[in-house]
Amino acid sequence: MDKYKIADRRLEVAASFGRRGARVADIGTDHASLPIYLVGNGIAPCALACDINEGPLRAAKLNIASAELTDRIDTCLTDGLNGIDGYGPEDIYILGMGGELISRIVLSSRLSKKEGVRLILQPMTHAHDLRRDLFASGFDIVDEALVRDRDRVYQIIVAEYDGIIRTATQVELWLGKENIERGGADLRDLASLYAFGLGKKIKGYAEAGKTDEQANELFCELKRLAETVN
């Protein structure tokens, strides 16, 4: 049984993709909840809790001290991955941000492309843009998952750099190829949510006398998944 608990199901599933023994960096740390869980339970030997703002770092420091892990978890005031190369992180978590921001953080740093580095990403929005940018920049999505937490379905994307440029269908970018292959209620509900939003957008196009064939095709595929996945 884990000594240190994590209340957030989203963070718990993200943590499950970490590799035992890997040095961790948590970018945009959430009160250091994830580093405390990983280090406190012996999954990671040490961790770096990072944030661009002082407030979250102050809260993180208090929680780290309360957990008696100040000798194994450090904090860092930084923008994205800037300035943490010397720490040598192997598993980098970037959770709870917009997909476009995550993409900017990942692609603007050479650290993310270093051999042996794994990225565990959880976009709140624009997961399709994040996947597209990863594939176009030589990253492989080695695993992914859908997780339901507080009546919302989140996407978790695990990526590693190998320099190979990849492509994917529109629906694979939106939902993830492995998630589609697995199926399940979470996939069905997420496809339904995306289809609803895209349907409103298509209706707006029609009212303006415009059409978007790519959007129409994606809408049909999302709707099909929403109606047929068990």
Where are these regions (language model features)?
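S-adenosyl-L-methionine
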Residues: 1-21, 36, 58-87
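Class I S-adenosyl-L-methionine
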Residues: 2-7, 82, 100-230
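Conserved class I S-adenosyl-L-methionine
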Residues: 21-30
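Conserved SAM-binding loop of SAM-dependent methyltransferases across substrates and taxa
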Residues: 31-44
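Conserved SAM-binding motif I beta-strand of class I
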Residues: 46-51
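Conserved SAM/SAH-binding beta-strand->alpha-helix loop
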Residues: 53-55
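Short SAM/SAH-binding signature in class I
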Residues: 89-96
